[in-house]
């Protein structure tokens, strides 16, 4: 008990992480969200680890344009705390597991949102927002003309339309499902999504 630990038995901090050796991705999600974590758990590339942090949603009501705007304003105050917590696991990348605010204000708004995140996490770590990821994916597919399906109210759909246009796409149509709450987004039946795609977006 009283013997000193030998040098051979001392636990030293690893120079290179073996968990998440290719990437440790901190995923910042709303406290109401049940979809992003579920999806990430089904997509685990070798050498990549997910680390989830939630920001509190005090106002989950999305049933009108006014309530949707209140939701956007509220999360601006709680996201920084989740980022602060996430940084303690020393991630190599930040992924924003929410999309609404990343479209707000179009291309410039997404840039400003990313800069606010940088104020918390610093200049070195990579940051992926929903809007930036959408643009990168569409460009990878060579898309020029797009139609979009969102869970948002009309005020949110306008922001998506603006962002897509400002990033160079011809936007034929944006349809919002007008989900009542932040949690109900994940409860949308697949049949409802498919119906909208086939009957309102297909051909656009």
Write out the residue ranges for each language-model feature.
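N-terminal glycine-rich anion-binding loop in soluble enzyme alpha/beta folds
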Residues: 6-80, 154-192
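Solvent-exposed alpha-helices and their adjacent loops that cap or buttress functional pockets
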Residues: 16-21, 43, 118-121, 138-141, ...
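Hydrophobic structural segments
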Residues: 23, 48, 74, 126-131, ...
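Gly/Ser/Thr-rich loops at beta-strand to alpha-helix junctions
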Residues: 29-35, 98-110, 134, 151-156
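Short, well-structured alpha-helical segments in soluble
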Residues: 74-88, 193-204
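Glycine/small-residue-rich loop that forms an oxyanion/phosphate-binding "nest" at active or ligand-binding sites
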Residues: 83-126
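Conserved acidic residues
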Residues: 92-95, 144, 204
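Conserved beta-alpha
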Residues: 113-180
């Amino acid at each position: 008990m009283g013997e000193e630990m030998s040098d051979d038995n001392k636990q030293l901090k690893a120079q290179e992480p073996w968990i998440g050796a290719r990437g440790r991705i901190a995923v910042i999600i709303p406290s109401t969200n049940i979809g992003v974590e579920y999806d990430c758990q089904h997509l685990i590339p070798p050498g990549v680890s997910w680390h989830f942090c939630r920001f509190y949603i005090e106002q989950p009501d999305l049933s009108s344009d006014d309530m949707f705007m209140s939701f956007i304003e509220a999360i601006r105050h709680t996201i920084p705390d989740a980022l602060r917590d996430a940084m303690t696991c020393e991630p190599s990348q930040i992924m924003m597991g929410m999309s609404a605010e990343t479209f707000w204000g179009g291309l410039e708004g997404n840039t400003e949102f990313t800069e606010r995140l940088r104020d918390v996490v610093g200049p070195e770590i990579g940051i992926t927002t929903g809007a930036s990821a959408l643009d990168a994916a569409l460009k990878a597919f060579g898309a020029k003309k797009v139609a979009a399906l969102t869970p948002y109210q009309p005020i949110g759909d306008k922001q998506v339309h603006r962002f897509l246009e400002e990033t160079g796409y011809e936007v034929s149509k944006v349809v919002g499902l007008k989900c009542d709450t932040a949690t109900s987004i994940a409860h949308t039946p697949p049949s409802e999504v498919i119906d909208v795609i086939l009957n309102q977006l297909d051909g656009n």
